[in-house]
């Protein structure tokens, strides 16, 4: 059995002044999440707002405990970069719980 962990990362950029600046910040963050943690990442909300963004990251693994620990590492890392401007929600499900056809 496999597990899927979804992390919804809500970000606030109070000092950012443009969509261009936001995109630059997000591009760097997404690349680092992919390199450091092997996460698949996409911007999933607030595309047209220059001070807010929501990213959704996915991690997949065979062991729920290891995946939880890995997700907690992602959360610590993101909160370390944005201590006052981030909130991370974590959801873990088994592939058996998904309605796959």
Task: Tell me what each language-model feature is.
Residues 37-40, 81-82:
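Short catalytic/binding micro-motifs of nucleotide second-messenger systems
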């Amino acid at each position: 059995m496999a597990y899927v962990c979804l992390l919804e990362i809500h970000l606030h950029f109070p000092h950012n002044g443009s969509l261009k600046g936001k995109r630059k910040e997000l591009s760097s963050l997404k690349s680092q999440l992919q390199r450091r943690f092997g996460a698949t990442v996409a911007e999933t909300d607030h595309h047209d707002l220059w001070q807010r963004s929501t990213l959704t990251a996915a991690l997949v693994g065979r062991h729920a405990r290891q995946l939880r620990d890995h997700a907690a590492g992602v959360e610590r890392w993101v909160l370390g970069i944005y201590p006052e401007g981030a909130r991370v929600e974590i959801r873990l499900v088994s592939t058996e719980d998904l309605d796959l056809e």
